[in-house]
Design a protein with these regions (language model features):
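Charged, alpha-helical interface segments at or near domain boundaries
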Residues: 1-113
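Short, well-ordered loop/turn elements at secondary-structure boundaries
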Residues: 42-46, 54, 98-99, 128-132, ...
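Residues in well-ordered beta-strands of folded domains
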Residues: 49-51, 105, 136, 146, ...
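Structural alpha-beta junctions
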Residues: 86-90, 127-131, 164-172
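Short amphipathic alpha-helix segments
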Residues: 112-126
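Amphipathic protein-protein interaction modules
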Residues: 125-153
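C-terminal structured domains
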Residues: 141, 147-189
Length: 189
């Protein structure tokens, strides 16, 4: 039986970008499918999970939550993106110029996840970049971008990745991503 909207865990889910943990096929601890987090592959190094902000902590949406609330993974994804968009307002998301790049600031936790919001890149951030975007997301709370044709900006993104990666927490990617035709792809070496 589905829960009412007032008791729904899934309705509060926020899409959250996470690094894929290498899998050797042997689980460290056997866990029932219902107890595992809902995971949507983004690319070969990143995935989308769904978190519920419970003020004192963040809780992963698990497969059992989908079953209990009779919601599909695709519907969860739409809910998660909508709630991530709402976070840009409630967490005061803003773009801050920094040397040759633009930093996206939003109170920690969800900055890198903002690459999932097409509306930001197609409209809100368009005033900062004329061509294709280049973005670095080395950790969950770090997102910076520039025009992909601006070599000084690309170098600054590389420097940012190098600064964040060794000591970083909740690391995501050491790659620069290029947004072309509405999708993000790792920059070719």
């Amino acid at each position: 039986m589905p829960l009412s909207a007032t008791h729904s865990i899934v309705r509060g889910a926020i899409a959250y970008l996470k690094a894929i943990v290498p899998d050797d096929g042997t689980p460290a601890l056997p866990v029932a499918h219902a107890d595992t987090p809902v995971i949507r592959t983004y690319n070969d190094e990143l995935c989308v999970c769904y978190l519920v902000d419970r003020s004192s902590n963040l809780r992963y949406v698990q497969n059992r939550d989908l079953e209990r609330e009779e919601i599909s993974a695709d519907e969860l994804h739409k809910i998660g993106l909508r709630n991530l968009w709402e976070q840009t307002g409630s967490r005061n998301a803003r773009v801050q110029p920094y040397q040759n790049i633009f930093a996206v600031l939003m109170s920690g936790d969800f900055e890198a996840s903002l690459i999932l919001l097409d509306r930001l890149w197609e409209h809100d951030f368009r005033k900062f970049v004329r061509g294709d975007y280049a973005a670095a997301l080395p950790a969950r709370d770090v997102l910076a971008f520039c025009d992909s044709s601006f070599e000084e900006g690309l170098q600054e993104l590389r420097n940012l990745i190098a600064r964040v990666t060794p000591p970083g927490d909740h690391l995501l990617s050491q790659k620069i991503y290029i947004r072309r035709d509405g999708t993000w792809q790792p920059q070719k070496a």
